[in-house]
Design a protein with these regions (language model features):
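A generic structural signal for short coil/turn motifs at secondary-structure boundaries
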Residues: 74-76, 95-96, 189-192, 238-242
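PLP-dependent aspartate aminotransferase-fold enzymes
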Residues: 109-229, 246-247
Length: 254
């Protein structure tokens, strides 16, 4: 069994750190008691953010930060086109998919035009947790299997299903019995057949990862578990964000 990840634990603020904080920051951290324990606060000295524009953030003291972390605002904070579109739609109509509406159809068509022909349907979800949850359930229904493979530092969501597939949540989270972990495709540290992974061609690196997947599938089969899916984001963001060679996932998929 692979070692459980503690990435989230390592980055988290803990109550015993409060004594070193200024009074205002300490007060805000104490007031977070109204939030559930799954809400994590980062850093020994938590950042109190009040404004964002583009790739920059500002805290309550006016200190400016370059945001190279946040995964929420993928087109930049407060992008004027996004703000304008949200404002216009919120001022006109906010409802669900049980009624006819052109916008959802046009949006779906735009997205599908960028996808392979095999992906010809869309089911919109509100969060990544829900999207991954649905993807796994689709894979399990299609294959008739239950087994899911993830990388050793992966985070895939907070739902009942995806949290059991997220080693990055740390030791407080029980992992699924039908889940298997493979090593993170770390081009900085891995050595493959005596050669640093960073020097490997895409096919060579992909063959290594495909071998790790095959070993995980074989272990599932030894325990009577049928393989259903490999769940991964292509940059392995929770694992560390690795610049792996373009096309390396093809041998894994094949």
């Amino acid at each position: 069994m692979a070692t459980r990840s503690t990435i989230m634990d390592t980055n988290s603020f803990r109550p015993e750190m409060a004594a070193a904080l200024d009074p205002e920051t300490r007060k805000l951290t104490e007031e977070r008691d109204v939030l559930g324990p799954a809400y994590r606060l980062f850093y020994r000295n938590p950042v109190h953010l009040v404004k964002g524009r583009g790739s920059h953030l500002w805290d309550a003291d006016g200190e400016e930060y370059l945001d190279v972390y946040n995964n929420v605002a993928s087109v930049g904070h407060c992008h004027p086109r996004v703000v304008d579109a949200l404002t216009q739609q919120a001022s006109m109509l906010n409802t669900h998919t049980r009624y006819l509406h052109e916008n959802i159809l046009h949006y779906a068509e735009d997205i599908l035009s960028t996808m392979p022909d095999e992906l010809d349907r869309i089911m919109f979800q509100c969060t990544g947790s829900e999207a991954n949850d649905l993807a796994i359930r689709v894979a399990q229904t299609y294959t008739g299997g239950e087994g899911v493979i993830v990388t050793s530092e992966a985070y895939h969501g907070n739902s009942a299903l995806t949290s059991k597939l997220s080693p990055a949540l740390g030791t407080a989270q029980t992992l699924g019995l039908t889940m298997r972990m493979i090593p993170t495709p770390d081009t900085y540290r891995l050595v493959i057949d005596g050669k640093p992974a960073a020097e490997c061609a895409a096919e060579e690196f992909g063959n290594w990862m495909a071998g790790e997947v095959r070993k995980a599938v074989a272990d599932m089969e030894r325990h009577g578990i049928k393989f259903a899916a490999l769940l991964a984001d292509s940059i392995f963001s929770s694992d560390g964000v690795y610049p792996d060679p373009v096309g390396y996932l093809k041998p894994v998929i094949d």
